[in-house]
Amino acid sequence: MVKRIMIFIEGTTFYTKFPMFLFSKYGYKPIGRAIEIVNGWQKQGYEIYLCSYVRKRRYKYIKRIIDFYGMKYTEILCREKGEQYSEIVERIKPDILIEDDCKSIGGQKERCITNVREEFKERIHSIIVPEFKG
């Protein structure tokens, strides 16, 4: 069975430079060896789901950035209006969820895993990394 890894993009794999990240791919900078690591997992056969804080209407924008830097993925996930990150996690059902600690925006209450229902949460290996440290 193929394992699924879901990774939050901003703050976990990419550093964002305000306000450039709003309109330019150069506002996104890969953190450390994030691209190499993610591409290695993909090469090993993992399904890679990248989750962005941009809304669905800006999907093409974030896709261009990810493709520009050469990160491999199965799917890029963006929220619909009114959709919560926890709903995306529950829909994808990743084996592993990697996200940052959300320190600059309120910490634990802002993490994707926080509001995931227990029946899903117990099957997910949650990895929290320091924000912008990769």
Protein language model regions, located:
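Alpha-helical substrate-recognition element adjacent to the catalytic core
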Residues: 1-79
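C-terminal cap/substrate-recognition subdomain and adjoining C-terminal extension
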Residues: 58-134
